[in-house]
Amino acid sequence: MTPASPTPPAFYYLTNFERALAWLGERYDDLFDAHEHAFVRQFATLPQASRALLVRMLMRNGSDFRASKLVYDEIGCTLDAAAPLVALGWVDPAPALTLDALFALSTKAELLRIFPALAAHAGERKADWLERLRPTHDVAQPLDAWCAQPDDRVLRVTVGALCDRLRLMFFGNLHQDWSEFVLSDLGVFQYESVPIAPSSRAFQQRGDVDAYLALQMCRDALEAWPDDRPFDDLIRALDAVDCAQPWLATRRAKLLFALGQACERRADWYAALDAYTRSAWPGSRHRRIRVLERCGRDDDALALALDARGGFESDEERQRVERMLPRLQRRAG
């Protein structure tokens, strides 16, 4: 392992991001659409400070940033660096902010200046303030419409989805973010150069990337799904995902299993049974047996348990099913 340099070059993160773009261009050029080709081409023509600012924003969470918080010696004036990004449409210099977005970008002291009436509830948390204001502030508007901020602006990155797609192709997943790779010169993360043949690429066609992103959207939606809303729309979205690659089909099966568990927590047995039936994820058959039992379909549960006994998928399934069989046999008569 190469020792980390105590004083990396000022634009080390930009250099590494550009290395990532070059790597993607060499290996995935045939999967890029016109927008992605244009991004890679135009990024290279931007002033260094503008390229660095965009990478800095991509390394951080979210898409909205206070310009006053984007202070980097090597970049200089944030608004000057942002101007070419604004010209390309990659950054919105005056995005409409919901109340939630405004709260996420503001301290309690700043919120008190914007909403003086909150002083009567100074001891409450920001979350409490948000709930107080939400019923009467449901219109999104730019920062200067919320309050006069002559010395500050909000900048919104508008190419986040495109860059997430590039990040997915680079890492092969969405768990890792750009900060991991671009910080490698600090010794925080180390990567070896490994040659990858085209046949060994994680994504063989553009549809594979589309499928991964669609599955990720479904997973994110499941985690945030309202308790009182049926899963019908989510199930339709999952059905629409074309998983041509076996490893993508496995991800879909895992998500269907998670959906089945969510349905069980709601005691929505029929929806749970449907999700488990369509999932090949380990444990799905055992969960189907349990759900059939909860539905009062003892004969069907017993038949599936006996079928499982003809070829267990794992020792864990064998133990679970064999514990269930005596009870199912008694209940089925």
Positions of predicted regions on the chain:
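Residue-level detector of alpha-helical recognition elements and their boundaries
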Residues: 68-69, 304, 316
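N-terminal alpha-helical interaction modules that lie
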Residues: 2-39, 44-52, 56-268, 273, ...
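"A position-specific structural signal for the A-helix of alpha-solenoid helical repeats
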Residues: 254, 258, 283-294, 320-327
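Extended, non-transmembrane interaction/recognition domains
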Residues: 255, 271, 297-303, 318-320
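Helix-capping and short linker residues that terminate individual alpha-solenoid repeat units
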Residues: 284, 313-314
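Alpha-helical linker/edge segments of TPR/alpha-solenoid repeat scaffolds
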Residues: 294-304, 324-333
